[in-house]
């Protein structure tokens, strides 16, 4: 109705392209405008100045021959001061942007291996944005921001990557477990060594106490019973220890059966053997 009366409304964040007899005349700002249609004035079309978003999926191959799908998100808008170029120079803005994105991604990703592609996705996005900005500025468009939102490897490659990561985790866990067992064994060995050391110290003190006791017993008996020699006292002590040993073996419930001579003559022989062994040991030491 308004156009029939020669008036037109342009909404906010939009501009209208005015033509006179098919030739560009001016860009109409938001508001109400009079168009004398009888003089050949008309609106050729409207152009939105809002930020628009285009998601582009580009399949390409990395340097290590892995096929990936790179998903790029392009945010762009038409410039009000270049509305004429934006309206007339491009017939399909989205297809044009998509073509530039394909070109830049397929030129950048094949230079990188798969891991580097993930690590340098911000650099790829910056390269795409720079190239798009140079190209689209000639057509009256501004590239607001470019994001690489996803990098999708082939399904089989993704499964293999997950298996590699799982194997790496298991290897680390096994290494940590082995290290823990190693530390445990070291600590156990240190504990056993300390235990044996303390046990040895106890045995040494026990034997020293026995030697001291025997020496005192021999001296006391020799002084109490005149006419006895040290040899007689040692024979008696050895016989006493012999019977004490038999008593301990018989008293223990876990002892094995031990068959040894235990008559008086056998005791004398054992005492003689022990005494001779001590004398030989002393001679060897001297």
Swiss-Prot record:
A lipid is attached at residue 2 (N-myristoyl glycine). GO terms for molecular function: protein histidine kinase binding. Keywords: Cell membrane, Coiled coil, Lipoprotein, Membrane, Myristate. InterPro entries: Band7/mec-2_domain, Band_7, Band_7/SPFH_dom_sf. CDD domains: SPFH_like_u4. Residues 156-190 form a coiled coil. It is found in: Cell membrane. Its main location: membrane. GO terms for cellular component: mitochondrion; plant-type vacuole; plant-type vacuole membrane; plasma membrane; plasmodesma. It is a lipid-anchor. It holds the Pfam family Band_7. This is Hypersensitive-induced response protein 2.
